[in-house]
Amino acid sequence: MSEQPTVTASHPSGSIIRGSVQPTDPAAVREIVGSTGFFHDFEVDVAVELVQERLSRGLASEYHFLFADLNAHPIGYACFGPIPCTQGSFDLYWIAVHAAHQGSGLGRRLMAEAERTMLAGVPGADGRPLPPARRVYIETSSQPRYAPTWRFYERCGYTIEARLKDYYAAGDDKLIYAKALS
Amino acid sequence: MSEQPTVTASHPSGSIIRGSVQPTDPAAVREIVGSTGFFHDFEVDVAVELVQERLSRGLASEYHFLFADLNAHPIGYACFGPIPCTQGSFDLYWIAVHAAHQGSGLGRRLMAEAERTMLAGVPGADGRPLPPARRVYIETSSQPRYAPTWRFYERCGYTIEARLKDYYAAGDDKLIYAKALS
């Protein structure tokens, strides 16, 4: 039995969205996230670790992925999962498009597919489908260089629900974006 | 080499605070957390898993514990750790005193020792001491039955920095308490 149905959808750019995770994906995530120039090395490492944990632990990891493949090569991805001890709240941990493919609408497409997947009920750690997602949270930094990121989330319908002062470092707050799904 | 210096301090109740984790502690945590009547079974399971992860992974787990032992039997504990990708922010994951020993000031004592430990610089995943904690976060529910918990955090100097509506479930918000250490 396949552990998760593969989500496949074509995109005007020619890319294909898939929900399965492949052994070559950790390296692809390192390339995609690194290409954006937005993240510290230790943050790139965290992004890669989530894919590795999904590969090693399967659904028990509770990390779910969507990859956008162009000519069988990943050029963007989203990573999300249910928040433990909540009923229907999800974290969107990562969403990134390779620098060479930004501005094509692929980020919006990945976000829409991720939300559709969460609403449809992803498999839980035991393989049984979870109830539909009610709310999605995204955390990001208040540093001005993230302004394009904020605008992307806002275009996708997310609003700032909380700000934690000096969370990442002195002068670097955490912004918590949220969106109710329905 | 011991992986973490044991913190030992006596308390008027006769209990001793220790920072080492023992193989019998998962069962002790189940007893302590279960005795409070505050938590769902799946939440008790999460509390126990954190101790198990510390025992199996050691410092790499990034979970730190303080136990209050009375006659060598744990009657309360705190669990905390550095928040990945932050400089000096910590989560206090759990703090609980066995129902039979509440009202003795042991919760306050555990909180003060936990803050002192975070300020002193706990060992990181590589064993080297982390910089002192700047900020501590505690998450809890908005459900009225948690009112004694809110009052405890407030007496310890924590204030509500954010509220995430319907986070745990419809009508059950997440409150994020924070305190700046110095």
Report residues per predicted region.
Chain A
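Conserved N-terminal entry element of GNAT/NAT acetyltransferase domains
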Residues: 1-24, 179-182
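Short hydrophobic/aromatic beta-strand or adjacent loop that forms the aromatic wall/cage
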Residues: 63, 172-176
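Acetyl-CoA-dependent GNAT
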Residues: 19-102, 108-113, 117-124, 163, ...
